[in-house]
Structure formats: structure tokens, C-alpha cells
A protein has these predicted regions:
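Bacterial N-terminal signal peptides that target proteins for export
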Residues: 2-13
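Bacterial N-terminal signal peptides
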Residues: 11-22
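Boundary at the C-terminal end of the N-terminal hydrophobic targeting segment
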Residues: 27-29
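Alpha-helical scaffolding within the catalytic cores
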Residues: 39-46, 100-104, 127-130, 163-180, ...
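Metal-dependent polysaccharide deacetylase catalytic core of the NodB/CE4 family, i.e.
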Residues: 58-66, 70, 113-115, 135-214
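Aromatic- and glycine-enriched glycan-recognition loops and surfaces
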Residues: 73-88, 122-124, 166-174
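C-terminal domain-boundary segment and adjacent tail
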Residues: 75-109
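Substrate-binding cleft of extracellular glycoside hydrolase catalytic domains
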Residues: 118-124, 139
Length: 214
């Protein structure tokens, strides 16, 4: 009796193994994706045609080689150069605001992969570090300082949205004029005195003053 039981058990195991051998290939075949020739595949986002007269914006702030302080959203000069090299190697073409406005008004179209480079807040590092890099690449950019920060007298701390900041970290008007005279940089305005947070609701949430007081 035990022999018969063992025989039946072994037969069941063999039946399962045989079924897996015969039926598994059919299951595997269903899981194998159908081959699609490269020319027939859908284009991914990186391969799709660049939309007409569209551009992307890359926004930078401070460029600091001593400490890349994230309170100022800082990046090191070597990292900035690496990013610029990547943009150039991948076909991105920096454009000016003047080019963008002209394209929107029926003028010359923007190039494919048009890119607007902006540097906010008006750090003096733009004069010392960024401008030489822009000259090397011959790329346009936008510098948008905060008016009252640039107005801060020498020797006084700048109230950087509640963060006490050394005056020399912010550009002077003389430096901004030299930057504008370079022919590569357009000067914008990162507000005159609205670059700080205020309580935006009864719950105490903080929001930029520019969007809560206008």
C-alpha cells in the first residue's frame, strides 16, 4: 500500500514537471515583447522635435567656490562650467530676452533647444565668476538683482530675506554697469524690495510677499 502511495505521489510530481516543460515555453512566448525596428518606434521626449519658438529657462543664483551655501542656492564654478559644457554638447542654444521677444513679435524664430540663462538676486559672484565663463562660451544671460540689496551701503549687512549677508556678497551698481556693458548680459529686476516672506494665512504659512500683497 505504501509502495502504491509512493508511486502515485511520484507520478503526480512527474506530471507537474512535464506540464511545466510543455506549457512554460508558451507562457514565456507571451511575455516576450514584439520587436519593433528603430525607424518604427515612437520618439521619446529627448528625440521629439523641439516646439516652434519655445524655450526652457535655467535659473541660477550664487556661484561660490568656498562653500556652495544652499541658503543662497549656490553652485561651484567648476559645476557651472560642467553644466554649460553639457548644454553645448547636447545642442542647447542660449538666447536673450530680446531674441525671445522678437520671435514672439514675428521676427526671427528661436533656434531649436533655445535656453534662457538667468541669475537671480544680484550676487557679486556674477561679476567675478559668471561673466568670464559667459565670455568664454559667448553666451547671453540675464542678471536680475534685488534693488534694495544693491542699494545697501558698503560696510552694512544685507537683509537677504531675513538672512544677514555680508555686503560684498551682493554686486555694486558699478559692477552691474560693467556687466551690462559686456554686451552679453541683459539686466532685469528681481523686485525692488519684495524678495522676502510674509505670513500668508491664519495658519502661519510663509509665502513670497510679491504674491501675497499684490
Amino acid at each position: 500500500m505504501s509502495f502504491l502511495f509512493s508511486f502515485l505521489r511520484l507520478s503526480s510530481v512527474l506530471a507537474v514537471l512535464l506540464a511545466s516543460v510543455f506549457f512554460a515555453p508558451a507562457t514565456w512566448a507571451r511575455d516576450i515583447p514584439v520587436f519593433v525596428a528603430p525607424k518604427d518606434r515612437l520618439a521619446g521626449p529627448a528625440e521629439a522635435a523641439w516646439p516652434h519658438n519655445q524655450f526652457v529657462t535655467l535659473s541660477y543664483h550664487d556661484v561660490n567656490d568656498t562653500v556652495a551655501d544652499q541658503r543662497y542656492v549656490a553652485v561651484r564654478t567648476d559645476n557651472l562650467i560642467e553644466q554649460f559644457n553639457w548644454l553645448r554638447e547636447n545642442g542647447y542654444q542660449p538666447v536673450s530676452i530680446a531674441q525671445i521677444l522678437a520671435a514672439r513679435q514675428g521676427g526671427p524664430a528661436l533656434p531649436p533647444k533655445a535656453t534662457l540663462l538667468t541669475f537671480d538676486d544680484g550676487f557679486s559672484s556674477f561679476f567675478h565668476r559668471v561673466l568670464p565663463v559667459l565670455r568664454t562660451f559667448q553666451w547671453p544671460a540675464v542678471l536680475a538683482p534685488v534693488g534694495t540689496w544693491v542699494d545697501t551701503p558698503q560696510g552694512q549687512e544685507v537683509d537677504f530675506g531675513g538672512l544677514s549677508t555680508p555686503r560684498e556678497q551682493i554686486a555694486t551698481w558699478a559692477q552691474i554697469k560693467a556687466i551690462a556693458d559686456s554686451g552679453l548680459v541683459e539686466i532685469g529686476a528681481h523686485t525692488q524690495n519684495m524678495h522676502y516672506g510674509v505670513q500668508a494665512n491664519p495658519q502661519g504659512s510663509m509665502q513670497p510677499v510679491a504674491v501675497t500683497r499684490i
